[in-house]
């Protein structure tokens, strides 16, 4: 495997080098009330190659003008990138065929517009999706869960744009690594720190998952979709951090002072429960299966299978 490109390892401003990808289609209604029509819209994803920050834009259709407007919205909010990486639109999957044909059809106009803005538009070689793994992972995190969360629900373009923005906040709140190696520091570094300089915090809202669909207003249904997305995303993200191995030997690599995520199925959106390992408690066979964790609300005891270690600076550099 080759070395990481310089855009991935050179410190600089967020969204200076970005990866671009499309996902969809998502089916929405053109207006509220009776007589509405079902139309398509798409998700345009921008991911920062340095800090894995994600920006989501709803695109009304696959035209050059619609994409350029979404790019202008991105530049207005995140700043102008120096280079944009994208695939070349070659897709075998039927659902992605129209997206691929759009990119191939507008290859030259997109490059011309980017060059006018002093942006270097780069396309990866054909049939090499692994060259764009960082934005493919972002699309997977957003698209697959959004499809399962939305299901057969048909929202308006404005409601879908709001949902995309809330999903973006969830993805940008994920813990990357501890802020420091101090055992008393219970804060973690997230992509949100590079965007606004502090963690992203959501407004408190009541749990709507157990309320009947017919009793919810449109705004409450949108909030319910967000809460559903949070639960699914949290479980999938935690499973990526955990190593699925058999418990025949002591495979725990937790040490005192490590920062961990506490798996909690009832955690509200954007509320990641973090803590530091105070003490490992061995069993009669000498294998530790339980640990005392220092959190902002005191010391708690949790099984190791409910703890996910955040990578340290040595892990990231090694």
Regions found by a protein language model. Give the residues of each.
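Alpha-helical scaffold segments of alpha-solenoid architecture
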Residues: 175, 183-210, 214-218
């Amino acid at each position: 495997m080759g070395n990481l490109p310089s855009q991935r390892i050179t410190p600089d401003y967020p969204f200076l080098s970005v990866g671009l990808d499309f996902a969809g289609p998502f089916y929405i209604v053109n207006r509220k009330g009776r007589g509405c029509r079902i139309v398509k819209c798409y998700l345009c994803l921008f991911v920062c190659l340095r800090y894995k920050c994600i920006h989501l834009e709803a695109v009304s259709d696959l035209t050059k003008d619609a994409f350029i407007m979404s790019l202008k919205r991105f530049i207005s909010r995140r700043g102008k990138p120096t280079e944009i990486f994208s695939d070349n639109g070659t897709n075998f999957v039927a659902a992605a065929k129209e997206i691929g044909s759009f990119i191939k059809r507008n290859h030259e106009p997109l490059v011309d517009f980017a060059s006018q803005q002093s942006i270097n538009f780069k396309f990866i070689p054909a049939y090499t999706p692994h060259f764009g793994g960082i934005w493919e992972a972002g699309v997977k995190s957003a698209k697959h869960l959004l499809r399962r969360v939305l299901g057969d629900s048909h929202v308006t373009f404005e409601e879908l744009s709001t949902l995309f923005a809330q999903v973006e906040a969830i993805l940008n709140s994920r813990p990357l690594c501890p802020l420091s190696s101090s055992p008393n520091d219970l804060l973690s570094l997230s992509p949100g720190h590079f965007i606004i300089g502090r963690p992203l915090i959501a407004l408190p809202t009541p749990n709507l998952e157990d309320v009947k669909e017919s009793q919810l207003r449109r705004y409450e249904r949108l909030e319910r979709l967000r809460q559903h997305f949070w639960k699914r995303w949290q479980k999938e993200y935690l499973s990526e951090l955990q190593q699925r191995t058999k418990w025949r030997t002591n495979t725990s690599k937790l040490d005192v002072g490590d920062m961990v995520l506490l798996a909690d199925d009832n955690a509200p959106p954007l509320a990641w429960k973090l803590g530091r390992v105070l003490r490992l408690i061995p069993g009669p066979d000498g294998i530790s299966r339980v640990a005392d964790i220092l959190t902002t609300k005191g010391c708690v005891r949790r099984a190791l299978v409910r703890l996910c270690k955040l990578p340290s600076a040595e892990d990231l550099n090694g």
